Amino acid sequence: MPISCFKCASKCPARALEKIGKNMTVDEILNEVISDKIFYDTSGGGVTLSGGEVCMFPEWTGNLAAQLKANGINVLIETCGFFDYSKVSEYILPYVDTIFYDIKLFDSQKHKEYCGVYNDSVLSNFVTLHNNMKDFGFSLLPRVPLIPNITDTDDNLSSIAAFLSEENVSKVQLLPYNPTWYNKAEKIGTKPAIMLQELRSFPAKEQIEHAKSFFTDKNINVGGSI
């Protein structure tokens, strides 16, 4: 069973393992963020809460978001959509300005295969957020990562586009695949779980334009690093 508590790092005789990062309280994070508030005020920026999955810790995340908002700092969260909506609604949504919401795979079985869980709650949570975003006052942006032969297939993109169109979503962000992780995996002696040759290259412009067409055909505006 994999060890994820970092106890092995302190015992590693060759010091090959090192824990990166540190535990911080909400107050410690807030103090550090506030020290840079002048930059947020000047640029119109704010704080992005990402992960991991911040919605797995709704009370802690909500506490931080509430204090950020109380200090006039814009709050954005990134989520995979797999969370308990009732808790997120209670603790987080009142203090969020923007939500980036990843929709990777529309087919539930494939979502289970690649992401480890079925996507029923991912899709239903998106619909509920979209229906309630005006009441809470946040904006919601769905995002689709374009992973070669996994998420960028015609079937997947057309299904996601149809789903978003049915919910009257007006904008989506496409995230073109970045292959730089592949070489990093090899350098640390890890064999990538998926050995597709397509995963070694950046997508061609034609591939990205093809992906965009599924959404523009549904009158959905496409943004992102494209």
Region locations from a protein language model:
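Conserved dinucleotide-binding and phosphotransfer motif residues
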Residues: 15, 67-71, 218
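Radical SAM enzyme core and accessory elements
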Residues: 217-226
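Active-site anion-handling motifs in enzyme catalytic cores
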Residues: 24
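Cysteine-centered iron-sulfur cluster-binding motifs in ferredoxin-type domains/subunits
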Residues: 1-15, 53
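A structural motif corresponding to the C-terminal lobe/cap of the Radical SAM core domain
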Residues: 162, 170, 185-214
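Iron-sulfur (Fe-S) cluster-binding segments and ferredoxin-like electron-carrier domains
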Residues: 15-21
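Conserved AdoMet/S-adenosylmethionine-binding subsite of the radical SAM
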Residues: 27-186
